[in-house]
């Protein structure tokens, strides 16, 4: 196998984790926003001939970003952005296990009748999982998931969202993690590498449900983003939408592969993507470069046509926010205080609702630096400046934050 393509600089443990993944994959790469993950580093990309990694795709299957460019300008926004932030917080459901309470919640979406549901091996589990998915479609969750309102350099307003397939994807991941270790669906098993042969019955079932979770995540992000555009009184002019925790069938060097991206954005020449920074930093709309340069094309190929999915964490959640009990009692203080976080976003002029110290801008790299480390493989089309950021509250207990 070729040596993995590594962008940027990384902690030794992150590189060790990449080498471990690469020892089982046919090709591998690590993006500049990479950091230590579960089994596979965040920012990692791995290509397999006939396998897919359940842990590589991850527990939040199809986590990704969607951005809508509206017909509005900054001058057309309400004069008090705090009221807009409150309206988003009241309209969209944030947090672990939350249900979509909106009158027009998409509970009748066609994906709930998809034949892929039959791939869940147990009827009781299938019904339970589908019911949960139905109730959560169009909810955002917690952790680093968000709804943002941006203005670009021309003062055009964008709405951006980041989240995945919610409890549905989590249930699929845990179910197949067990099946892949020869245990029953629902049993608790170690979070270790679990490679499924896509041509096997279990691998085929996972592939079907992973793709269904991908459709589910797309539907949820589009519903939320369009709901916020509706709140703004605007109209959609462009949608940029991508997963960054997923597996795809792709051709590389004329050969077919199953490509797993764990916290990495697809960036084929001409393909657009939406990449966030932090609650107090700019985001970007990027596009894979279509270059005449053989050197650039070779670098893109070695990156498996991938780029960063964000700025990249440099401080763990526990180091940043400390440890708390489920009731919120601090058992170990963290390095980042809420006051530090609020001072940063205030200086940037951002109206923030929710968010915790574990998501403060202090815990991330700066996005321009990681984009520069990717070299000439992608180009920035729009820089998006955050005006309103809405997330789950700091008090939200989530044992699965990653």
Where is each model-derived feature located?
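Acidic, glycine-rich loop-and-strand cores that form catalytic or ligand-binding grooves
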Residues: 103-112
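Domain-length cofactor-binding catalytic modules of enzymes
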Residues: 1-16, 23-30, 38-42, 46, ...
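N-terminal cap/recognition module
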Residues: 50-71
């Amino acid at each position: 196998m070729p040596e993995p393509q590594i962008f940027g600089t990384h902690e030794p443990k992150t590189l060790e984790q990449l080498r471990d993944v690469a020892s089982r994959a046919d090709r591998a790469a690590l993006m500049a926003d990479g950091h230590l993950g579960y089994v596979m580093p965040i920012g990692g990309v791995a290509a397999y001939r006939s396998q897919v990694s359940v842990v590589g795709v991850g527990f939040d299957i199809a986590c990704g970003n969607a951005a809508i460019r509206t017909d509005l300008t900054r001058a057309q926004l309400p004069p008090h952005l705090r009221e807009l932030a409150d309206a988003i917080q009241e309209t969209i459901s944030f947090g672990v296990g939350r249900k979509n309470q909106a009158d027009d919640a998409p509970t009748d979406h066609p994906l709930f009748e998809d034949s892929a549901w039959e791939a869940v091996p147990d009827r009781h589990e299938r019904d339970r999982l589908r019911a949960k998915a139905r109730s959560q479609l169009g909810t955002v969750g917690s952790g680093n998931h968000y709804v943002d309102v941006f203005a670009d350099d021309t003062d055009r307003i964008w709405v951006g969202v980041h989240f995945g397939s919610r409890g549905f994807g989590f249930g699929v991941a845990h179910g197949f993690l067990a099946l892949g270790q020869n245990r029953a669906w629902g049993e608790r098993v170690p979070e270790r590498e679990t490679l499924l042969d896509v041509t096997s019955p279990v691998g085929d079932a996972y592939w079907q449900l992973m793709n269904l979770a991908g459709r589910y995540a797309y539907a949820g992000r589009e519903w939320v983003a369009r709901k916020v555009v509706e709140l703004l009184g605007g109209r959609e002019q462009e949608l940029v939408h991508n997963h960054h925790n997923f597996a795809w069938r792709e051709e590389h060097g004329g050969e077919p592969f199953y490509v797993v991206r764990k916290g990495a954005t697809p960036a084929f020449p001409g393909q657009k993507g939406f990449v966030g920074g932090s609650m107090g930093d700019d985001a970007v709309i990027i596009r894979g470069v279509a270059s005449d340069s053989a050197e650039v094309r070779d670098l893109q190929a070695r990156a498996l046509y991938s780029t960063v999915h964000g700025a990249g964490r440099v401080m763990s959640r526990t180091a940043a926010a400390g440890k708390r009990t489920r009731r919120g009692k601090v058992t170990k203080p963290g390095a980042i205080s809420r006051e530090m976080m609020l001072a940063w976003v205030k200086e940037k002029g951002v109206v923030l609702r929710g968010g915790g110290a574990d998501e403060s801008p202090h815990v991330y790299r700066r996005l321009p630096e990681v984009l520069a480390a990717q070299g000439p493989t992608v180009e920035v089309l729009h820089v998006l400046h955050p005006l309103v950021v809405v997330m789950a509250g700091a008090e939200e207990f989530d044992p699965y934050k990653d």
